[in-house]
Amino acid sequence: MSPFELEFEGLKVQIGSIEGFEPRGEGPLPCPTVSDLADWDRKLFARYRVIAFPICDMCCMCTYGRCNLAEGRRGACGIDIRSNTARFTALKTCIGAACHAAHARHLVEYILEKLGDVEIDLGSEVDVMTPIFETLVGFKPKTVSDLEKGLEYIERELTKVLSSVHVGQEMDPHDYESKALHAGMIDNLALEIADVAQIAAFDMPKGEAPLVEFGPFAADDSKPCILLVGHNVAPGTEVLDYLEERGLDEEVEVLGICCTAWDVSRVDDRSKVIGPLSRQLHYVRMGIADVVVLDEQCIRADIVEEANEVGSRVIATRDLVMAGLPDVTDEPTEKIIEKMVSGEWMGVFIEDLEKAAEVAVEVAIRVHERRKKEIPQPDPKKLQKEAKRCLGCGDCERVCPNDLPIVEAMERAANGDFEGLADLFDRCVGCARCESECPTKLRVMNMIEDAWRLRTKEEKYKVRTGRGPIKDVEIRQVGGPIVMGDIPGVVAFVACPNYPDDVKQVGKMVEELLERNYIVLTSGCTAMALGMYTDEDGKTLYEKYEDRFDAGCLVNTGSCVSNAHILGACIKIAAIFAKKPLKGNFKEIADYILNRIGACGVLWGTMSQKALAISTGFTRWGIPIVYGPAGLKYQTLYIGDLDGDWTVYDARTGKECKEYCPIHLKYAAEDWREALVQAVKLCIRPNDTPQGRQTKLQNYIELYKEFYNELPPDLPLYVRDKNDVPITLRDEVMEYLEEVGWKPRKGITEPTLLEENVRG
């Protein structure tokens, strides 16, 4: 029952809103606009140079064009290439933010309609439940309907930023980047609204989570299988509800690819997480699914065609992804089921989620036995025969984003050796461009997958499903050690599986950091990639390391929207440990994170506009980002400029000094070793105590020497005096520092970029 709905015998009274009960933003700056935070952005750009990497020199945005902007030229509207590149950064960030905003809007409205105005409760150990919302919107939401205030703010600001990319609007590259930061920041708010709403409504884990089975062979293919693909858990919850109502919980397998997989496993841990986005085409072609249910985001544009080819029926459920399918929402349920079972309708769009769930379950049950007999299994003879059709032209390798040695693998397969093809599976990003280029139309991905299946037989792992928020008690225990530097850092491995090489490289980085006592958080497709990394005993990192927000522990927060809890943990350190007020207080909180909390994000396989929005938002809050090499295609990085303004004030005394950390805000690494070194370095903060700085520098120096066989050349930037130098490395480091003319300097106790924070 709604809190504004009264029911008596024979009478129901509904009250829309009560005068005086409307929550209002409080604090210095509730619901800040672009211009409200432009001065904070300028402080960032005064030290971090915006480096542009335009993908194309041409601008085709209006009918004046196309205009060549190369070599200092300007377009017909007057724009230059730097501003145009920044404009596209803002545009792509808006696209990503719009995805999460639409997702959050749908979840909130769906929950209000289906369950009423649910109270927001993230468990007894989480009191600061919505740190991003409180910091930006200015009040603490109590029920799901309160979250609509945040959505209104998001939609208002997103519309403004998007309008700025129109011809004849913004013209300055830094102001475009400022707008990109704004869109990213409100994207982070959308993440929190979506995840908090679904945790409250669907009783997801609240700070702890079980281990679940992971991988395509975790599915019991002797049962009817429903495969959920996308990011919005609402259709999946309806499937689970229908199965429970019918008593079919144990009779039908519910599987998931991408973030829907994490979220449905958070609702019911009997569901199976089978793989990330990069495996979507592979696993659809395997024919595991009797029915594929689509919701939204990260869905391949050819999924309907690919699913139908192996006899899987497809049901689209969101108007964001109608997929050209007939809208049968208003058709009788039994008619839809009959036509899908017969194959007359191989794919349909059903916007009514309850009906979609019923159809999915009933169709899966009825087609399963027939489909099971039709699914082809890997055949070594057929695989060898296909490999012999390869011309060795190399067209596939030229378009492969990872330059995989496909031709060599085909030659080996033609001679009956399939190991080369099988080895490509973990390095394949699943784009299938090789197949589009092949003059003989070889199904290259199928061949790679078949070779892998012949070798693997059965691949099952254990992963920890998403646990959602970080508990307040965890923040109290580690807030001090993080701020002082005794815990060397908090590193988040997030985003897409567009890895530049073997998927297991992510696991190598994470394990190295865990062994060095960093707190590691993960989410989304990267959290799945970690599940594929095992030790010699076959154990995954989730089985080896504890699920706690503490030194040397590994936390999976959940799906992409759960990234809000990663940022939220940093905000909660400011609120719980430092007693900073949150409401409407973005600048002070971001300043605290930038100067005192050693946190960093690694997006090793970044691909989507959503990942750009998430990461760009994090940088505005003061959390630096390391991309993989694909991050260059986002077109702008924020690289430290040693000639910039690195002035930091001591809030106690007003004393000024230069502190060159974190040295970058957005960085792209060429290989995993460079990414690991940068992640460690970007956890260095002005607030580090001598002991904390020693710990951080020891990790930085040891890794740099291991990979590059020399001391880091930028050590003088981070050594304030000899007490910062690790004892075991002191002689070597001090000798080097003296050679390069380093001079000791004093640190400060309360670093801030904000002059208004100075008390002395």
Swiss-Prot record:
Any one Gene Ontology molecular-function term assigned to this protein's record: nickel cation binding
HAMAP family recorded: CdhA
Pfam families: Fer4_9, Prismane
Binding positions ([4Fe-4S] cluster 1): 56, 60
The protein's enzyme class: oxidoreductase
Binding-site residues for [Ni-4Fe-4S] cluster, renumbered to this chain: 231, 259, 298, 496, 525, 560
Cofactors demanded by this protein: [4Fe-4S] cluster; [Ni-4Fe-4S] cluster
Keyword Metal-binding annotated: yes
Quaternary assembly: Heterotetramer of two alpha and two epsilon subunits. The ACDS complex is made up of alpha, epsilon, beta, gamma and delta subunits with a probable stoichiometry of (alpha(2)epsilon(2))(4)-beta(8)-(gamma(1)delta(1))(8).
Keyword terms, alphabetized: 4Fe-4S, Iron, Iron-sulfur, Metal-binding, Nickel, Oxidoreductase, Repeat
Domain spans labelled 4Fe-4S ferredoxin-type: 381-410, 418-450
List of residues binding [4Fe-4S] cluster 4: 400, 428, 431, 434
Catalytic activity as recorded in UniProt: CO + 2 oxidized [2Fe-2S]-[ferredoxin] + H2O = 2 reduced [2Fe-2S]-[ferredoxin] + CO2 + 2 H(+)
Domain of life: Archaea
Similarity comment: family membership: Belongs to the Ni-containing carbon monoxide dehydrogenase family.
Species this chain originates from: Methanopyrus kandleri (strain AV19 / DSM 6324 / JCM 9639 / NBRC 100938)
PROSITE patterns: 4FE4S_FER_1 (PS00198), 4FE4S_FER_2 (PS51379)
Residues engaged in binding [4Fe-4S] cluster 2: 59, 62, 67, 77
Annotated CO binding sites: 100
Protein's name in the database: Acetyl-CoA decarbonylase/synthase complex subunit alpha 1
UniProt remark on cofactor binding: Binds 7 [4Fe-4S] clusters per heterotetramer.
Enzyme nomenclature, EC number: 1.2.7.4
List of residues binding [4Fe-4S] cluster 3: 390, 393, 396, 438
UniProt-listed InterPro entries: 4Fe4S_Fe-S-bd, 4Fe4S_Fe_S_CS, CdhA, CO_DH_a-bundle, HCP/CODH, Prismane-like_a/b-sand, Prismane-like_sf
GO biological process: acetyl-CoA metabolic process; generation of precursor metabolites and energy; response to hydrogen peroxide
